[in-house]
């Protein structure tokens, strides 16, 4: 988190034409403010929060993390607020998702593209690497240098890309820098 917060430049103080700010979200379990890192607008802070949120909002499955249905104002008959996915099953799924790997770069052209990417200024937001926390719950993921090509910050992309939907601390025009790792494997 310290690394991401060090990249914050909400008012373009360095005059590079790019401003970015961290998304701060509330941990639904503890009520503590956390750094948002997942989702289009960095509205969730962990793989577990993202997974529980997807279960809740996408398919209506409640967890202990998000035990209440997200029905919106238009729904008349909303589901009941009972946990449908156990903590043990959620934790197993989170571990699986957390340990999924990203494929290695494949050829010289891809690596040559990285230089052009940097020269064009793309790496100002799509930062090539960062280091994972020494305190990650999974030992396999502690102190790892990863190459996600993101700064995990929110950037105001203007009215042409705005969706008019706020999420967490993000406005309708703000989006988390999309991670670009693994794109060539699609």
Predicted regions and their residues:
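Periplasmic c-type cytochrome electron-transfer domains
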Residues: 1-186
């Amino acid at each position: 988190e310290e690394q991401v917060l060090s990249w914050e430049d909400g008012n373009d103080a360095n005059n590079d034409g790019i401003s970015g700010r961290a998304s701060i979200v509330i941990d639904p379990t503890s009520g503590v403010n956390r750094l948002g890192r997942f989702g289009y607008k960095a509205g969730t802070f962990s793989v577990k929060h993202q997974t529980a949120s997807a279960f809740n909002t996408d398919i209506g499955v409640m967890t202990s993390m998000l035990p209440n249905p997200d029905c919106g104002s238009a729904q008349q008959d909303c589901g009941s607020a009972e946990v449908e996915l156990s903590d043990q099953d959620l934790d197993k799924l989170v571990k699986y998702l957390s340990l999924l790997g990203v494929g290695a770069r494949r050829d010289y052209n891809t690596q040559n593209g990285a230089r052009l990417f940097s020269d064009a200024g793309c790496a100002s937001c799509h930062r090539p690497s960062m280091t994972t926390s020494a305190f990650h719950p999974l030992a396999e993921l502690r102190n790892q240098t990863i190459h996600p090509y993101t700064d995990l910050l929110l950037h105001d992309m203007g009215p042409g890309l705005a969706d008019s939907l706020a999420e967490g601390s993000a406005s309708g025009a703000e989006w988390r820098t999309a991670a670009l790792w693994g794109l060539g494997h699609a």
